[in-house]
Amino acid sequence: MAIGIKVKKAPADYDLGASKFFGTPTVPLAWEGDFYEDEIFLCQIKLADIAKFDRENRLPHTGYLYIFLHTDGGDYDLEADVRYFYGEPELAIDDFNLEVEGYEGFNDAYLMEFCEINDGEACTRLLGVPSDWNYEDTPPKLLLQFDPLDSEMGFLDHLDGFLYFFFGKDENDLESVTLVEEYS
């Protein structure tokens, strides 16, 4: 089972604590100043929003999951910074991506809507198995599959394939999540 993600551009007065790609991240106060200069905000997921679809309880059902990207290597060498916070965020960081060269335009928020889908469906989604896995070995466990052509966000729209965020050996260790760019 996988959790599909559909996105729509957020209205001006949206809830900053909503599940979304880009826009203003809302984070714990303790994280203030805890980001690198080359880091951009990709998404935040309010885990209560996905609880009814995560029947295997692979993710927590409270708090927030965040994905930031280190961009020092450019579009073709991104690195994931995946974080979990168990409570409610207290700090909104406006224009998070504005100072990162090449990513200044990714400040508009795109709200996420979740639905249950088949494991291998080719779209932006959580969990399941990676689409287009062309290798003989068993694929790593998937946290997030991002399909740049699945929306009008414009992020990495030159990538004809997927960004995969794979769990490490321990799904509870989000610091071990790896990012793989896969071209079709």
What are these regions (language model features)?
Residues 1-184:
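Preference for intrinsically disordered or flexible, low-complexity segments
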